[in-house]
């Protein structure tokens, strides 16, 4: 029984130290928030292998991220069609929808870029 008390006491001290460390880190993070930090400009997306009419050229970084996330999720969940090509390559074909506002913006942006 006395061994359990010792272990519990040591664990309590370690937990207290950990809680103090977390609190200090959170306080420090809160103090530095917004002080002289400029919003980092997102790097311009670059798709060197995409053709001139490729939709990726008119996508915003947020839309690109939504597409990447959707593709990975669909692939991992077994969505779409994944086949082996005669040359040894892998073909992955899937259709998915972005939110309506993104779809409308992409329709307008692609129409303007082709005109």
Curated annotation (Swiss-Prot):
SUPFAM superfamilies: Nucleocapsid protein dimerization domain. Residues 35-44 have a biased composition (Basic residues). GO terms for cellular component: ribonucleoprotein complex; viral nucleocapsid. It holds the Pfam family Arteri_nucleo. InterPro entries: Arte_nucleocap, Nucleocapsid_C. It comes from the Viruses. It is found in: Virion. Residues 1-54 are annotated as: Disordered. Its main location: virion. One of its GO terms (molecular function) is RNA binding. Residues 12-21 have a biased composition (Low complexity). Keywords: Ribonucleoprotein, RNA-binding, Viral nucleoprotein, Virion. Belongs to the arteriviridae nucleocapsid family. This is Nucleoprotein. The gene is N.
